[in-house]
Design a protein with these regions (language model features):
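Iron-sulfur cluster-binding electron-transfer modules in prokaryotic oxidoreductases
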Residues: 1-295
Length: 295
């Protein structure tokens, strides 16, 4: 089975470990990733605020290149890339006049037939295979953190439940993990304010880190490079603000799956994390037991 692959800028830069772990897990489940040729930046996170046509043209060109390669679907692991590609596809489907303008701008044919999928959407298709290949049950309490861009706006991304998504929970349950019940699943981490308003990111991220820790999660699991960066890289600022020493690691979902499937930590990029990935001894109780706090 093959699927188009759009790594985007983050996965070749600040989130190399996401790219490495996506590729390692897909290889293990016999899913071939065909990288979109001559791809460009999708425009996240500033293009849509600065130039509307540019914000449409950049993702449209990526999808046009995928069409030219004969691809029917494209996996965009970065949540921001997924959101921009899905939003552009929806916008150009709804406005044929604007679609023609963008086609003339990118100088490539574009029909809108290529579907855009996020990493959770793709891996859910292979949940049974992932479960079959699990050799080290991931028996930890985990906080599944979806962030803003995977599930919103719901009429555009058309994925999961916007207020209480479950796809990552199901994936992690398939490898033996116990997702906690918490209210921060889709809270904002501060996103691109990481540079200009570090104080805001420390405030928002601190709430997420504190709640996951209070509920005894062994790790926070994400599917967004920006979320991972803000909760991992900005940990010193978060700890200073809250006068704590929070050490809970922040894993990409593909890293958690990869560990359970016996893939070496080096191949999953765990050494790249700033907050050391030190997991406790796996829990021995039945994963289905629920002793989380009520609020």
């Amino acid at each position: 089975m093959r699927i188009g692959y759009y790594p985007g800028c983050s996965l070749l830069g600040s989130a190399k470990e996401f790219n490495e772990s996506v590729r390692a897990v897909c290889e293990a489940i016999d899913l071939t990733l065909e990288e979109v040729l001559d791809w460009n930046c999708c425009g996240a996170s500033s293009a849509h605020a600065l130039n509307h046509d540019l914000a449409l043209a950049l993702p449209a060109r990526i999808l046009a290149q995928a069409e030219a390669a004969g691809l029917e679907e494209v996996l965009a692991p970065c949540a921001a890339c997924f959101n921009r590609l899905a939003s552009t596809r929806a916008a150009l489907e709804a406005d044929l006049v604007k679609r023609q303008e963008i086609v003339e701008l990118i100088e490539l044919p574009y029909s809108g037939r290529v579907r855009v999928l996020n990493v959770l959407e793709v891996l859910e298709r292979y949940r049974d295979r992932i479960e079959e290949k699990t050799v080290n049950a991931f028996r930890y309490k985990v906080a599944c953190y979806y962030g803003c861009l995977l599930v919103r706006p719901p009429d555009v991304v058309k994925f999961d439940r916007p207020e209480n998504p479950q796809s990552m929970d199901r994936l992690l349950q398939s490898i033996g993990a116990k997702p906690i019940d918490w209210a921060c699943k889709t809270e904002c981490c501060g996103a691109s304010f990481s540079v200009t308003r570090t104080d805001l990111v420390a405030h928002l991220g601190g709430r997420i880190i504190a709640d996951a820790t209070r509920r005894n999660a062994a790790a926070i699991v994400v599917a967004c490079p920006m979320c991972q960066s803000n909760l991992d890289m900005r940990r010193p600022e978060i700890n200073r603000r809250l006068q704590q020493e929070y050490r809970i690691p922040v894993l990409f979902v593909t890293q958690a799956l990869g560990l359970a499937m016996g893939i070496e930590a080096q191949r999953l990029g765990l050494q790249r994390h700033l907050v050391s990935v030190e997991l406790p001894e796996p829990e021995l109780e039945v994963v289905g037991d629920d002793d989380d706090e009520d609020d």
